[in-house]
Amino acid sequence: GEECDCGSPANPCCDAATCKLRPGAQCADGLCCDQCRFIKKGTVCRPARGDWNDDTCTGQSADCPRNGLYG
């Protein structure tokens, strides 16, 4: 299966020919991915909204999980 979106050859993290991450890359895109690496745990990826707390990166994924916590 695909590890990354190979539709854009400009993505430096993804090999457009194989749709696989390039050697050394942890991720190719996502709110918690920066320069092919997972953003460190606790970094705000989605600011608080209303009564909801900030959503933060896990350090293990490129996705920004919804923490579901009220402030």
From Swiss-Prot:
GO terms for cellular component: extracellular region; plasma membrane. SMART domains: DISIN. Residues 1-71 form the Disintegrin domain. This is Disintegrin horridistatin-2. The disintegrin belongs to the medium disintegrin subfamily. Its main location: secreted. Pfam families: Disintegrin (PF00200). PROSITE patterns: DISINTEGRIN_1 (PS00427), DISINTEGRIN_2 (PS50214). It is found in: Secreted. Expressed by the venom gland.
